[in-house]
Regions:
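Sec/Tat signal peptide C-region and signal peptidase I cleavage site
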Residues: 22-26
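Bacterial N-terminal signal peptides that target proteins for export
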Residues: 1-11
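Hydrophobic alpha-helical segments and helix pairs
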Residues: 89-145
């Protein structure tokens, strides 16, 4: 693929918003009823926790800010996304990882390529991560097979799967960018099921009992040639994943999939904060 063709294809991918067929544009830009979700998974040797928050981008009309904090044992990550509200298309992304080493990676999604910047701590231990010395910059090419697919982040799949579930569409595909790799995620419908829940709803108390859930399946495959080891994760899960949404409230109640070193796993909603009415 020559440079001009690649530019046109990638520009098309950024501008064609990959909208689902049923919801209107106004519905696609409405924030979901929740503002924060917190999940937890307990294993014999560790407890994994994740917190997701979604708000409108105050200085960027038509865009959302998604923040995610996940931790297990001594490792943690802090992810910030700026997304197009209509599609979930990435505008910018950052990931601060802490563990044996610390590093901050930021990504700017341009029509021709992704600008990737990597920072690491300097001599000042109190320096903010955004001010850490720049270690490297890299232009990451979009894969030839991206086409007009929406390019998003794994955490944003929680939003897109909920939106997909509210349509009459039977299947949908998006692309996910990790660091150097790209993945195709195919969304489809599973059989509705009943699920036992036990979570805290801020300001309203404990919610427990049996809920009817809509099942959305995610099938993850490599998109283009792998440039690094496999690194797709969604709240610690990889491979094929199922998301279970409360049919009545729309809240994501549980994720089911495979976790490294653990095997088959279920990650359940532990608390939720609903958005204030405006």
């Amino acid at each position: 693929m020559n440079y001009l063709t690649q530019t046109l294809v990638c520009t098309c991918a950024l501008l064609t918003l990959g909208m689902f067929t049923a919801p209107s544009r106004a519905e696609n830009t409405a924030l979901p009823p929740w503002q924060t979700l917190e999940f937890e998974q307990k294993a014999l040797w560790a407890t994994a926790k994740s917190r997701i928050e979604l708000v409108a981008a105050p200085q960027h009309p038509g865009q959302w800010l998604l923040s995610a904090n996940s931790s297990v044992v001594s490792n943690s990550e802090e992810v910030h996304l700026r997304l197009l509200a209509t599609s979930g298309q990435l505008v910018s992304r950052s990931r601060l990882s802490r563990g044996k080493n610390q590093r901050l990676k930021t990504y700017h999604y341009r029509p021709q390529y992704i600008l990737r910047e990597r920072r690491a701590p300097g001599p000042d231990p109190g320096q903010a991560a955004a001010l850490w010395p720049l270690q490297s910059t890299k232009e990451v090419a979009y894969p030839d097979d991206l086409g007009a697919k929406v390019l998003t982040d794994a955490y944003a799949l929680l939003l897109l799967a909920q939106r997909f579930g509210d349509t009459q569409t039977n299947s949908h595909q998006v692309a996910v960018h990790t660091d150097l790799n790209f993945y195709q995620v195919s969304l489809s419908r599973g059989q509705d099921t009943a699920i036992e829940v036990n979570y805290q709803l801020a300001g309203q108390g404990q919610v427990d009992g049996t809920r009817k859930a809509r099942v959305i399946k995610l099938k993850v495959t490599a998109l283009g040639q792998a440039r690094d080891k496999a690194d797709f994760r969604l709240l610690g899960l990889n491979g094929d994943i199922e998301l279970l949404f409360d049919i009545e409230s729309g809240l994501l109640l549980q994720l089911r999939g495979t976790a490294p070193r653990i095997g088959s796993s279920r990650i359940s909603l532990k608390s939720a904060t609903l958005r204030e009415s405006t």
